């Protein structure tokens, strides 16, 4: 029997589709208790604009979250000014970050079992004079951890990244033994803790074409990747690779693997997004909390139209719920 969980859901950029995706969820019943972290006025205005009859309930710690259709629990956050769907306003940037802080701290203190994030707009936050490179880095700093790992997943495929948002010219230098070791250990540990996989089987991509072709197409595999993987195998981590990325993503390899570790962003994610865009979930590993997110952006052109697809958000919630249940059931990864 699954363990009941309560998840915080941040509504993201107020001018984007995040608020209406949260409201769309409330039109049906839910298994997980969801608390939307957002401005109550924003949600009421957007519901009115879309013609949705949703009753908002003020939520406080210790109160059960609404799960019935037509009802939505909200932890109201101040600071959101008048918002026009589709029109960014940098004055709302601090409000957006406040929603993330409230959700993360609620996870850390046990009010929530995990958090799910709707998309934010990094550009407008930086235009407000706030240095912000993304959810992942923000939560890493707030939770005080040295390293986090970005993993995207569909029903059929999980892809984690050694490096994330780096120019391609900087990737090789960033793949150090220390980084590769930390990322692999986090991936292995969290596949156990949050996905219930006793002995994760991880495929590791090489950096260069043909995984370096024995050093003829680059020496990173020989000098960095292979020696590091050998040390990690000695720790009991099940690793296959480094493999050429162009053949790694085939059934021959994927059918016997639990996750793929790609060296850089555009090596691993195009395959996953081609396979399951709109059904994928972004997961942050290495945090002391559960955090999942949608695989798309703010979609300003769709905001306020009622045409936004909530498929990825449904997936993010489902995966967040499963991760939180797994953690509760096993006690793995619990905060001390």
From Swiss-Prot:
SUPFAM superfamilies: Isocitrate/Isopropylmalate dehydrogenase-like. Substrate binds at residues 135-136, 273, 282, 291. It is an enzyme of class 1 (oxidoreductase). Keywords: Cobalt, Cytoplasm, Magnesium, Metal-binding, NAD, NADP, Oxidoreductase, Pyridoxine biosynthesis, Zinc. Its EC number is 1.1.1.262. Homodimer. NCBIfam families: pdxA (TIGR00557). The active site is located at the dimer interface. This is 4-hydroxythreonine-4-phosphate dehydrogenase. It comes from Marinobacter nauticus (strain ATCC 700491 / DSM 11845 / VT8) (Marinobacter aquaeolei).
